[in-house]
């Protein structure tokens, strides 16, 4: 086939695929345009997950009638001059958003600047542009997108359900609302108001987005180094979520999901929170524009810093100083476990039920409630060593997290108590579910949990199936759900934290996944809630009970997330490590 130039329509549709890969991307681009136009109030309406209709209205400067045809041309912008590319101060600068949206759907732009007698409208349908026409309208701009991706039907095959796409749109608006707290924001999804925020300061906006109960627990941070300043709010190590979607980072007013910043936050919390948990964070970074390259990602979500090490160090130091305050010391572990390169042990063989009294107690009593008995502080006699115990007898507990045992052949065994108990809890919950339904424990005082509208929709949409897992949830007015019962095995769990984690799990799983598979992920999340935590001191009887139960549990060599629960060190391994082996 000979080389030929592509026609403009095909070029626009290819470019649209890079810029507008889903409805949330269109919402983000349109709201950024409104902010760049100096809007003090922005309204967003979503219908059908953003595939049916997106509307963004603002009271900004507006577009003159004569410039409307230019506004929907590719690489036409009022935000950039030739010499300003290295000092970008606006959210948008490429001139790609409107033409990309117009190439993918049906785009209508209605705008009126101050001083213009009436508004003007231009329509783009699948790349075809209609004539500008005068219409009535207030000062500002209204952009409507309908039937998104009708011109590129292949793109629709890769979209998730309308509810999930609406949730992603809402997340995008929330991130932008945090980036610009001085601007009022409203969001309506399928006719229902999701939120309506007046202009606020940062603290008020954080409380509106995260909920006042969580916002009151957040720690304020501030750090300045030369020309770089970091300010914001983070959660103590005792307040975490099941997903990282509650982390919002803003650089020079631009909401980003930059890997360097996210990694710095993760490193700051690394030895303070369990694996699989994520802190809450709302952070604003101010840095000279010439020290930042924002033109490195199609969605402008990632950045390139001139001094990445300095930025990383600033964030890690600021977060760790805040976490070291007296309010958070109780949640921080006193000793950290050094990293090793030991491989996980080979899969554990299945053994007959052990006859120890501790094992019977664990299997018959503790697995029923999935709660280890309180640790005793009185001196105890070590259990008698038995050569037929694959995991041996416990010798000690290391860092209040790992059980050290010795098997009959002299092998040292290390067991992660949380990961191991999590697997046992998960197996117990699965057995109850497969036998019909997981028993529910009604709460004496039902718990009211405030949540975003899209999380409420996810929970209520799966409410009937969640009831089969023992979690009974119902609507409770606007912006909240009522938790009436939790799985009996999780009777002591925090119902509000459980509901939030289940909502996060449903959101993170993606709605392309079958509900049954999602519920599997929910069940694993539930198991994590009731498992004995790292940092909990165990008595020898408790340690032995856990080891004996592991020996009779399938898949006990890994936790539900695939991490190892057991590591083994033979005498030969130790001799090689100490240089004794020939």
From Swiss-Prot:
It comes from the Bacteria. Keywords: DNA damage, DNA repair. It holds the Pfam family DNA_mis_repair. The keyword DNA damage applies. Gene3D superfamilies: 3.30.230.10, Histidine kinase-like ATPase, C-terminal domain, MutL, C-terminal domain, dimerisation subdomain, MutL, C-terminal domain, regulatory subdomain. GO terms for biological process: mismatch repair. Belongs to the DNA mismatch repair MutL/HexB family. This protein is involved in the repair of mismatches in DNA. It is required for dam-dependent methyl-directed DNA mismatch repair. May act as a 'molecular matchmaker', a protein that promotes the formation of a stable complex between two or more DNA-binding proteins in an ATP-dependent manner without itself being part of a final effector complex. This is DNA mismatch repair protein MutL. It comes from Acidiphilium cryptum (strain JF-5).
């Amino acid at each position: 086939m000979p080389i030929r130039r592509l026609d403009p329509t095909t070029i626009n549709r290819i470019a649209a695929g890079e810029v507008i890969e889903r409805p949330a991307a269109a919402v983000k681009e349109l709201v950024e345009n409104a902010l760049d136009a100096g809007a003090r109030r922005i309204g967003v309406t979503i219908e059908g997950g953003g595939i049916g209709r997106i509307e963004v209205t603002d009271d900004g400067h507006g577009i003159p009638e004569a410039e409307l045809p230019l506004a929907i041309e590719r690489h036409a912008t009022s935000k950039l001059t030739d010499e300003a590319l290295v000092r970008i101060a606006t959210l948008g600068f490429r001139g790609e958003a409107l033409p990309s949206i117009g190439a993918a759907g049906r785009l209508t732009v209605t705008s009126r600047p101050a001083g213009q007698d009436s508004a003007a409208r231009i329509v783009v349908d699948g790349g075809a542009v209609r004539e500008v026409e005068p219409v009535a309208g207030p000062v500002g701009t209204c952009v409507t997108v309908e039937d998104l991706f009708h011109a590129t039907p292949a793109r629709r095959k890769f979209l998730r359900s309308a509810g999930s796409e609406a949730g992603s749109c809402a997340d995008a608006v929330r991130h932008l609302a945090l980036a610009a707290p001085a601007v009022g924001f409203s969001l309506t999804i399928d006719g229902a108001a999701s939120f309506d925020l007046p202009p606020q300061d940062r603290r008020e906006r954080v409380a509106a987005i995260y909920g006042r109960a969580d916002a009151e627990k957040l720690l304020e941070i501030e750090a300045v180094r030369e020309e770089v300043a970091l300010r914001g709010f983070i959660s103590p190590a005792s307040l975490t979520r099941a997903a990282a979607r509650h982390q919002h980072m803003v650089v020079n007013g631009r909401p980003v999901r930059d890997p360097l910043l996210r990694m710095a936050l993760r490193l700051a919390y690394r030895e303070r929170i369990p694996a699989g948990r994520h802190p809450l964070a709302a952070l604003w970074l101010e840095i000279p524009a010439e020290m930042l390259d924002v033109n490195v990602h199609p969605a402008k979500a990632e950045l390139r810093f001139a001094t990445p090490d300095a930025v990383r160090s600033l964030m890690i130091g600021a977060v760790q100083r805040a976490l070291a305050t007296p309010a958070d010391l109780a949640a921080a572990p006193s000793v950290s476990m050094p990293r090793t390169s030991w491989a996980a042990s080979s899969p554990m063989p299945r053994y007959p039920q052990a006859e120890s009294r501790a094992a019977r107690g664990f299997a018959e009593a503790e697995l029923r409630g999935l709660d280890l008995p309180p640790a005793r502080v009185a001196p105890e006699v070590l259990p008698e060593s038995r050569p037929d115990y694959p995991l041996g007898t416990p010798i000690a507990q290391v860092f209040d997290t790992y059980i050290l045992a010795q098997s009959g052949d002299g092998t040292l065994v290390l067991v992660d108590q949380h990961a191991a108990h999590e697997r046992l809890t998960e197996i117990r919950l699965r057995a109850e579910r497969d036998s019909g339904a997981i028993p529910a424990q009604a709460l004496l005082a039902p718990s009211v949990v405030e949540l975003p509208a899209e999380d409420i929709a996810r929970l209520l949409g799966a409410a009937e199936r969640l009831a089969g897992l023992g979690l009974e949830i119902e609507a409770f007015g606007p912006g909240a759900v009522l938790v009436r019962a939790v799985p009996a095995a999780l009777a002591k769990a925090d119902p509000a934290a459980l509901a939030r984690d289940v909502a996060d799990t449903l959101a993170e799983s993606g709605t392309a996944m079958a509900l049954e598979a999602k519920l599997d992920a929910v069940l694993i999340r539930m198991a994590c809630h009731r498992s004995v935590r790292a940092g909990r001191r165990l008595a020898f009887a408790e340690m032995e009970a856990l080891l004996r139960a592991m020996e009779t549990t399938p898949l006990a060599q890994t936790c539900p997330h695939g991490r190892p629960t057991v590591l083994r060190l033979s005498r030969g391994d130790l001799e090689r490590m100490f240089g004794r082996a020939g």
